[in-house]
């Protein structure tokens, strides 16, 4: 008895009689059930830190926020030094920096199709509230990031601190301004673009230079983003 036979019965026999149901049930009982762990990726052993880009969060509303990281132990290589297979990533979001008050946690597979990046969207969070979050994969743990939700739609907060940035060109200068931005402890940061530039190496490279030619392919874009996101000051403001 096949699954298709059951489907045909539902379509053409006007539903299942008790006799047919028992016959199909007996047949289907011989099909092995998949373990709930069947799709889980095996633990991965890293030889260097896979969280080379740190962590980031964004796009909040009053009850949710998006958490991000990417596994890339060799960030400036195609594929980021990762295997062409899914790798399991655990995540936690807590009300304290020591993670004694974890409010949500889970696990997800980081896949090669998405460059082994993960996007988590925990919901049912408190409005106008700070949280800490982190990721784990294999024996590696990411830096801790801070994030916050928006005030409730009908709220009138006394104050909110915003920071605004744009046009960060890796070749044109260092990102040390983000040190001061993080020290100012903004509630939210708006990046208006451009986040990266596609130019070939050396066009503005008086301070430091892009890697490779003008970017066109997906691998080239990922490597260019890796150059930018490898900057520790940029990582710090993303995590602040």
Where are these regions (language model features)?
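N-terminal secretory signal peptides
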Residues: 1-16, 27
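Divalent metal-dependent phosphoesterase catalytic cores across multiple superfamilies
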Residues: 10, 42-240
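Bacterial N-terminal signal peptides
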Residues: 26-32
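Boundary at the C-terminal end of the N-terminal hydrophobic targeting segment
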Residues: 38-40
């Amino acid at each position: 008895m096949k699954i298709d036979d059951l489907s045909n019965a539902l379509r053409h026999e006007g539903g299942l009689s008790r006799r047919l149901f028992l016959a199909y049930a007996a047949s289907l009982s011989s099909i092995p059930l998949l373990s709930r762990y069947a799709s889980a990726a095996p633990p991965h052993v890293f030889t260097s830190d896979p969280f080379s880009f740190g962590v980031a969060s964004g796009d909040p509303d009053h009850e949710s926020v998006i958490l991000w990281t990417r596994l890339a132990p060799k960030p400036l290589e195609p594929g980021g030094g990762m295997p062409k297979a899914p790798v399991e990533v655990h995540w936690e979001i807590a009300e304290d920096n020591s993670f004694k008050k974890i409010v949500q946690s889970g696990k997800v597979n980081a896949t090669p199709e998405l460059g082994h990046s993960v996007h988590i969207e925990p919901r049912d969070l408190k409005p106008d509230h700070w949280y800490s979050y982190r990721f784990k994969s294999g024996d590696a743990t990411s830096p801790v990031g801070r994030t916050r939700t928006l005030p409730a739609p009908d709220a009138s907060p006394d104050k909110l601190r915003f920071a605004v940035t744009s046009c960060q060109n890796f070749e044109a200068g260092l990102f040390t301004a983000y040190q001061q931005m993080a020290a100012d402890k903004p509630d939210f940061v708006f990046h208006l673009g451009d986040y990266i530039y596609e130019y070939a190496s050396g066009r503005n490279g008086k301070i430091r230079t892009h890697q490779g030619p003008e970017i066109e392919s997906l691998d080239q874009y990922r490597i260019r983003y890796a150059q930018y996101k490898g900057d520790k000051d940029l990582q710090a403001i993303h995590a602040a």
